[in-house]
Amino acid sequence: MKQRMSRKENQVQTRKRLLDAGLEVFSRRGYYAASVDEIAAEAGFSKGAVYSNFSSKEDLFLALIDRRFTRDAREYPGIINFMADGLQSEKEPDFKKFVMRDRTWNILMLEFFLYAMRDETNREKLAARLEQLRKVMEENLAASYTKLGRKPLLPIKDLPWSIFSLGVGMMLQFYVDPDGLPKGVYERALQHLLK
């Protein structure tokens, strides 16, 4: 017999479903075209469920980036393995697979950038979140270089900017010209950055 969820578990599940629906709707329609009604319907709830979990559409939008950046911060040790093992590693990232698997999120990430570029208040909110993520990445990279007994080619504080720029730039080009991306170019460029 299936045990009933507690009130707290139910709230967590509802919030997760709303965030998942928000990810789909915002990436499909864009921030400005997406509606709270559409997000609620996608999640199988009423609009009231959205407002009992988020103060506004913007709050839900920003909660999506917070959720993802928290996950990404936990995954940065994978970069350390890539640094240590090099391109021959079985742990080597596959940029094309990653970009295709994460297409919905990547579209949403671009929507975040557009949202921030259109309004100064929004820009400051996204900038603060990106700064936190870069800080975590910088700390992980510094620890990695120390552990490996190596010195980076670029100042540590420049590496998160460079790594993000490399990934976002190649991602944009890949979505427009998927067959044009040279095999392994992202991995080689990342390896060079992390020498």
Set out the residue ranges of the language-model regions.
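Basic, helix-initiating cap at the start of DNA-binding domains
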Residues: M1-R29, A33-F45, E58-D59
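Amphipathic, non-transmembrane alpha-helical scaffold segments
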Residues: Q11, L19, I65, F69, ...
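Amphipathic alpha-helical segments enriched in hydrophobic/aromatic and basic residues
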Residues: F26, S35-V36, K47, Y51, ...
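Residues in soluble alpha-helical coiled-coils and helical-bundle/repeat scaffolds
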Residues: S55-D59, A63, M100, T104, ...
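Hydrophobic alpha-helical connector segments
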Residues: A63, R74-W105, I156-I163
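Amphipathic alpha-helical packing segments from all-alpha helical-bundle domains
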Residues: R74-N81, M100-I107, E120-K147, R188
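Helix-loop "lid/cap" segments that line or gate small-molecule binding pockets
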Residues: D94-M100, M109-D119, A189-L193
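Hydrophobic/aromatic-rich alpha-helical bundle segments in the mid-to-C-terminal region
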Residues: R123-A127, S144-L193
